[in-house]
Every structure is written in C-alpha cells, then in structure tokens.
C-alpha cells in the first residue's frame, strides 16, 4: 500500500497517511523492516506519515511502526484534561486528546490536512521550520502546542493546539 501511495500520490493528491497497524510491543529503538525505505521515500516526497504509539501504558518504548524513522509517533492525553495516558516514551513527538492513540493519530492527521492547506493558502515559508514539509508542520505543532508534564514517565510532551498553529501560519502573512 505504501508503494502504491508513492506511485500515485500526485495523481490522487495524497498528502497524509494514518498508518495504524501496531504490534503492541514496546520498542525503545527502531526495528528494521521492509517498510523503512518506503517511509523514507514518503517523507522525502513531503507526505506526512504518523502512527499511534500503542495503548499499554508502556514507558520503555512504543509500538511499531511509530518506532520507525520517518514515521511520527503520536500519543494521547485524556479528553478534557491534559493527563498523558497509554504509551508514554521519549519517541512520542506530539500528544492529542483521545481515548486511545489510534484516535489521537486520526485527529492529528486531520489537523495536518488543515495546517497544510493553511500553509499553501497563506504563502507561509515553511522552509525555515524544516527540511521537508512534514518536518516543518511537526515543528509548528510542537512549538505552538501546550506543554503537558507526565509525572509517571518524567517527560514533558507537547499537546496539539491547532488554533495556535494556524494563528502562527496566518500571522506570517
């Protein structure tokens, strides 16, 4: 499926992939797999790829494929408050309200579509924020996100604040 996206992303205007099959194992490091080359190519093409980190409360790793390079690892905070739950590890790049990390990842993929459109319509120069558009969008979302401390892991994560991300993009006009 990833190869199909690589081959057809221009024809069908594919810009975002919600990669949601998880292996439910705590990986502290990437696990070499057959999809790594495809993830690198998608990233190079400017296609956002993210995956949920898992729902086991791990603090020593996250599920595959979120553990892989060129795949952004999305965690969860409890809806209605900023309590990080489910898997919590330093590889998580952004947390989003959701009962499970799969729903958090779906929300961030929708946010990425909106942010990408805002960048295109506003003429925002994303190159100052990253080498690729996915890297730039992640940086924007992290820098405008709300800091959420997790006492259980000792880590601080950034929670998506789409309005602040959009305000940053449109303020640069």
Model-found features: residue ranges?
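Substrate-binding/access-modulating region of protease and related hydrolase catalytic domains
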Residues: 1-68, 99-107, 151-154
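Charge-rich, solvent-exposed alpha-helical interaction surfaces
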Residues: 38-41, 136, 140, 165-168
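Short acidic-hydrophobic sequence patches enriched in Asp/Glu that either
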Residues: 34, 66, 86, 129, ...
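Extracellular S/T/G-rich loop segment that most often corresponds to the catalytic His/Ser-adjacent loop
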Residues: 47, 61-122
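Flexible loop residues that form catalytic
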Residues: 22, 76-79, 145
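Hydrolase catalytic cores
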Residues: 7, 96-158
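Conserved acidic residues
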Residues: 15, 72, 161
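Caspase-like cysteine protease fold
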Residues: 149-173
């Amino acid at each position: 499926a990833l190869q199909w996206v690589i081959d057809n992303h221009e024809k069908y205007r594919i810009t975002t992939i919600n990669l949601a099959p998880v292996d439910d194992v705590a990986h502290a490091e990437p696990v070499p797999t057959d999809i790594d080359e495809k993830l690198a190519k998608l990233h190079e093409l400017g296609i956002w790829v993210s995956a949920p980190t898992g729902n086991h409360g791990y603090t020593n790793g996250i599920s595959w494929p979120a553990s892989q390079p060129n795949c952004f690892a999305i965690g969860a905070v409890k809806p209605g408050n900023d309590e990080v739950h489910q898997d919590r590890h330093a590889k998580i790049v952004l947390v989003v309200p959701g009962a499970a990390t799969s729903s958090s990842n779906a929300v961030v993929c929708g946010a990425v579509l909106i942010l990408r459109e805002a960048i295109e319509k506003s003429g925002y120069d994303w190159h100052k924020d990253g080498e690729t558009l996915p890297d730039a969008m992640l940086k924007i979302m992290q820098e405008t996100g709300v800091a959420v401390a997790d006492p259980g892991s000792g880590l601080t994560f950034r929670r998506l604040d789409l309005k602040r991300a959009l305000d940053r993009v449109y303020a640069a006009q």
